[in-house]
């Protein structure tokens, strides 16, 4: 079954909010995630893209997207997590991104503020994920913090 994206908005103006960047997979929502997410349409939310930060949260984002028809997933490895990614992460990401409920690759990019992962590694991961997005014809959700020139350079390639 093919996913309709974006969802059709209601004629009621209160139901036309599309949250393009959320993290409902965060442990901050563990206590009441289901009740909170289930209540979103009643609060005027017609759609949500839940952005992942690593392979594990890519799986979780897709689980949320499968459970709720108005949630979609962006799967990817955030620059903070590049150092922690291991093995065949790109192959696994590619499989996840082929899911009908995955509508983007993200949250990906560069973060030179904290440097939780070495900058060269961040650039490598960002470049590989941009190439995957091109291969799969998916848009990207970009994280850019204090790395504007390098981010633009990689996006222009």
Segments from the language model and where they lie:
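Mid-domain alpha/beta scaffold segments of enzyme catalytic cores
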Residues: 2-157
């Amino acid at each position: 079954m093919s996913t309709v994206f974006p969802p059709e908005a209601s004629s009621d103006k209160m139901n036309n909010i599309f949250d393009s960047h959320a993290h409902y997979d965060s442990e901050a929502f563990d206590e009441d995630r289901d009740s909170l997410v289930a209540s979103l349409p009643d609060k005027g939310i017609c759609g949500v893209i839940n952005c992942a930060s690593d392979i594990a949260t890519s799986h979780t984002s897709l689980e949320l997207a499968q459970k709720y028809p108005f949630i979609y997933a962006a799967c990817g490895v955030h620059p903070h997590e590049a150092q922690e990614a291991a093995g065949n992460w790109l192959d696994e990401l590619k499989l996840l991104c082929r899911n009908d409920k995955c509508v983007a690759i993200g949250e990906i990019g560069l973060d030179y503020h904290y440097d939780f992962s070495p900058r060269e590694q961040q650039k490598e991961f960002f470049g590989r994920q941009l190439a995957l997005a091109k291969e799969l014809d998916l848009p990207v959700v970009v994280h850019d913090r204090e790395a504007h020139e390098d981010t633009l350079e990689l996006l222009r390639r």
